[in-house]
């Protein structure tokens, strides 16, 4: 009988432990979705169309976030889309400057010069394209836009899935920012 009672206690303990783990897992998943929903809701009014962005006033620059190169050093398809959108905003006079921010941490990998080359090939004067060679993450790109390039008001260009996070970071860093998604393929 004692053995049976110990076995029942052990089973009860295992069930409680499993229930606690499932509850903890569900809370973690809920927290992730909750934070994501909060971030998206807090900046939703800052996501604009190209036309709306062109109507903004006193914008310092259009910030194009880097996102990878092909093996030959040309922009990846996603980066190409971002650059096209950034160039279009510049051409519509949404801002007087284009700030390209990306990874140039190794000599053989240089997102920012590839980005600048693309912009120049589209007719943007070299002196209107600023390069941030240390934009290794979204946070670093936005932080450096504020602290290195003295940006106070900007339009951020990235894919829609990434735009809310970039705008939220800008908001938390005290930058007045709007965003335009670069998703011509969807």
Predicted regions and their residues:
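A structural signal for short, hydrophobic/glycine-enriched beta-strand patches
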Residues: 37-186
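N-terminal type II signal-anchor transmembrane helix
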Residues: 4-51
């Amino acid at each position: 009988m004692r053995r049976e009672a110990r076995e029942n206690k052990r089973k009860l303990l295992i069930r409680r432990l499993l229930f606690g783990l499932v509850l903890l897992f569900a809370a973690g998943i809920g927290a992730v979705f909750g934070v994501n929903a909060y971030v998206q809701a807090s900046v939703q009014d800052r996501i604009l169309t190209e036309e709306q962005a062109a109507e903004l006033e006193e914008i310092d620059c259009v910030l194009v976030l880097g996102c990878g190169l092909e093996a030959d050093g040309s922009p990846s398809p996603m980066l190409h889309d971002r650059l096209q959108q950034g160039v279009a905003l510049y051409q519509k006079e949404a801002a007087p400057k284009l700030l390209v921010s990306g990874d140039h941490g190794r000599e053989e990998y240089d997102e920012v010069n590839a980005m600048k080359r693309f912009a120049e090939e589209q007719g943007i004067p070299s002196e209107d394209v600023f390069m941030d060679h240390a934009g290794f993450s979204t946070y670093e790109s936005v932080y450096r836009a504020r602290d290195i390039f003295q940006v106070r008001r900007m339009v951020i260009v990235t894919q829609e899935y990434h735009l809310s996070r970039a705008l939220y970071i800008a908001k938390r860093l005290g930058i007045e920012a709007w965003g335009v998604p670069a998703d011509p393929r969807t």
